[in-house]
């Protein structure tokens, strides 16, 4: 269990458990890490909430919102923002699933990808600014938790879109029900302990977003990819931060 959590932590963030060394992981080990995506999200939630709480009376809210957005992007190696950009480029520039997947493999960022990143960052900064000014910091703990759960929900029983291997293939082809249930349990406990009302709203919002996103990915790409899962994380984070800004 500890090693699976370490896999999730090192895959989703810059962090690494002490006394661990890089090694080649089996597809099953990668899939096992899905269970702990929400727990890694909780760690990232502290990276949202703690600076916001400690520095809110010292640093102007807008400047603090920009700094927190930059911090979380760096801590996650901008992995999910990259997925969002790739998906936007593929959908915006391709005319069929094969062409879209081909565009998504290109390491260069196009106009649609740049626009998607700019909009995601702008929405995050605006929402964080509103939440910081309202002094409601607990919802910030849950936003990355639920967004990482959304990736697990979307991956479960989703076909892999590419014929050849890719970063998301080991996750998508080996995820099992127990991984989903563990992730759901960790998210539910976190929501109950941190902020039950917002947690329930966040889960409902994610539950509505994931099926729609899966349907679109089937239509656009013929299935799911690692880039698409990263894009979903960014979309859900934007929606949840915006919801927190409106609720509080």
UniProtKB/Swiss-Prot annotation:
Its cofactor is Mg(2+). GO terms for cellular component: plasma membrane. The gene is cobS. The chain crosses the membrane at residues 30-50, 54-74, 112-132, 134-154, 188-208. Pathway: Cofactor biosynthesis; adenosylcobalamin biosynthesis; adenosylcobalamin from cob(II)yrinate a,c-diamide: step 7/7. It catalyses: alpha-ribazole + adenosylcob(III)inamide-GDP = adenosylcob(III)alamin + GMP + H(+); alpha-ribazole 5'-phosphate + adenosylcob(III)inamide-GDP = adenosylcob(III)alamin 5'-phosphate + GMP + H(+). Keywords: Cell inner membrane, Cell membrane, Cobalamin biosynthesis, Magnesium, Membrane, Transferase, Transmembrane, Transmembrane helix. InterPro entries: CobS (IPR003805). Belongs to the CobS family. It is an enzyme of class 2 (transferase). This is Adenosylcobinamide-GDP ribazoletransferase. It is a multi-pass membrane protein. It is found in: Cell inner membrane. Joins adenosylcobinamide-GDP and alpha-ribazole to generate adenosylcobalamin (Ado-cobalamin). Also synthesizes adenosylcobalamin 5'-phosphate from adenosylcobinamide-GDP and alpha-ribazole 5'-phosphate. The keyword Transmembrane helix applies. Its main location: membrane.
């Amino acid at each position: 269990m500890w090693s699976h959590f370490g896999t999730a932590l090192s895959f989703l963030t810059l962090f690494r458990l002490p006394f661990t060394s890089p090694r080649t992981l089996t597809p099953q080990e990668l899939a096992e890490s899905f269970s702990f995506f929400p727990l890694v999200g909780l760690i990232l939630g502290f990276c949202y909430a703690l600076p916001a709480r400690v520095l809110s009376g010292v640093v102007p809210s807008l400047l603090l919102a920009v700094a927190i957005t930059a911090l979380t992007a760096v801590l996650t190696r901008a992995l999910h923002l990259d997925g969002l950009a790739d998906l936007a480029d593929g959908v915006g520039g391709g005319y069929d699933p094969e062409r879209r997947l081909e565009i998504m493999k290109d390491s260069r960022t196009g106009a649609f990808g740049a626009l998607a990143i700019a909009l995601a960052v702008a929405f995050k900064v605006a929402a964080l600014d509103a939440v910081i000014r309202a002094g409601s910091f607990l919802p910030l703990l849950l936003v990355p938790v639920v967004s990482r759960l959304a990736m697990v929900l979307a991956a479960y029983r989703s076909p892999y879109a590419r014929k050849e291997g890719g970063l998301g293939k080991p996750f998508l082809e080996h995820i099992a029900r127990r991984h989903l249930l563990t992730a759901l349990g960790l998210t539910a406990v976190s929501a109950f302990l941190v902020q039950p009302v917002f947690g329930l709203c966040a889960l409902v919002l994610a539950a509505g977003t994931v099926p729609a996103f899966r349907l679109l990915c089937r239509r656009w790409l013929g299935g799911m990819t690692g880039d698409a899962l990263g894009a979903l994380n960014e979309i859900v984070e934007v929606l949840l931060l915006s919801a927190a800004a409106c609720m509080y």
